[in-house]
Amino acid sequence: MNREITFFGRFEADILADRKTITIRDSSESDFRSGEVLRVCRNEDGVFFCHIKVKSVTPVTLDGLSERHAEQENMSLDELKKVIKAIYPGLDRFYVIEFTRC
């Protein structure tokens, strides 16, 4: 049985179109392994919409986020930092989970 990861519904279309290829999470959601296949569901209602395969899990700080991270999230760097600050207020250490849709 595959473990599950959730995304806000606003990211579903980008994931399904392969425009979003990373997710940035805090330490409570950093225990995924390279090669692991995850069920992907919407955070708001738990509806399943695809599977992803984890490519890597890499630590990063808020200041360490780059234009490349923003590109992989399909947004600008300023937008990315605002989203991360809104989801994880007061935190500075995160994990970049790179994935491919399967």
Swiss-Prot record:
GO cellular-component term (any): cytosol
Gene3D superfamilies: Hypothetical protein
Substrates-to-products reaction catalysed: N(4)-acetylcytidine + H2O = cytidine + acetate + H(+); N(4)-acetyl-2'-deoxycytidine + H2O = 2'-deoxycytidine + acetate + H(+); N(4)-acetylcytosine + H2O = cytosine + acetate + H(+)
Keyword Hydrolase: yes
Broadest EC class assigned to this enzyme: hydrolase
Domain (ASCH) ranges: 6-92
Keywords recorded for this protein, A-Z: Hydrolase
Domain of life: Bacteria
Matches recorded under SUPFAM superfamilies: PUA domain-like
Molecular function terms from GO: hydrolase activity, acting on carbon-nitrogen (but not peptide) bonds, in linear amidines; N4-acetylcytidine amidohydrolase activity
InterPro entries from the UniProt entry: AC4CH, ASCH_domain, PUA-like_sf
Active site: K20, T23, E73
Keyword DNA repair assigned: no
EC number: 3.5.1.135
Protein purpose: Catalyzes the hydrolysis of N(4)-acetylcytidine (ac4C).
UniProt record similarity statement: Belongs to the N(4)-acetylcytidine amidohydrolase family.
PANTHER family: UCP029143 FAMILY PROTEIN
Protein name per Swiss-Prot or TrEMBL: N(4)-acetylcytidine amidohydrolase
Top-level taxonomy: Bacteria, Pseudomonadati, Pseudomonadota, Gammaproteobacteria, Enterobacterales
